[in-house]
């Protein structure tokens, strides 16, 4: 036996250290771990690879509008489980869960404010709430925002990010596609501008309705934009898909997106567009 024996270092029970949640985030673009405060200060754009991460609706509004000019509308509207949907978890339980995690009653914040001196009606979807799927409340709030813009003769800006129609509401969800599109048709008849901003991801029923109807359609870099997912299309058509299929860059090359704008330049670009539309307002 050895004369001197080095005692093993034992970890004290129950003292395992963990990194507090919310302090760091792993970038989906480059895989690097980035401090959350650094992402917030950089408008949720990765400082390492420039990947545009999902941005909470409240932060987006703050970055776009002039300070202290935003007035929220219909903040008290919230979804109800009309169909009594049951799955792995009930629709009611899911709504409660996402309300607790985001502080939102549903997946969009709407209102009006001033952008570089121009009055605008604005709706910003928040992917953190049930993948920003469009149910009856989301569709109603967006429709009311469009109607506010029409009544007050101001531009409408909608920042979209969505997984599509909300299956928990069935046909009530699908009819929002027609309702929002109809409101935009009335807005267009008054010769008033609508600027659509597509972020990552914008898909399915949202892309097939109001998100693709802008007078000017802007997309953020590398955003996934489309209707059905690549796997579904591949299995349905039995064909290989083009490289970069359903990316903002691919859609711009094929004329479905007017411009790709970095998030930090988005406010200035929208302001420039509004200056062209001034004669209409």
Report the location of each language-model feature.
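N-terminal hydrophobic/helix-forming segments and targeting peptides
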Residues: 14-18, 35
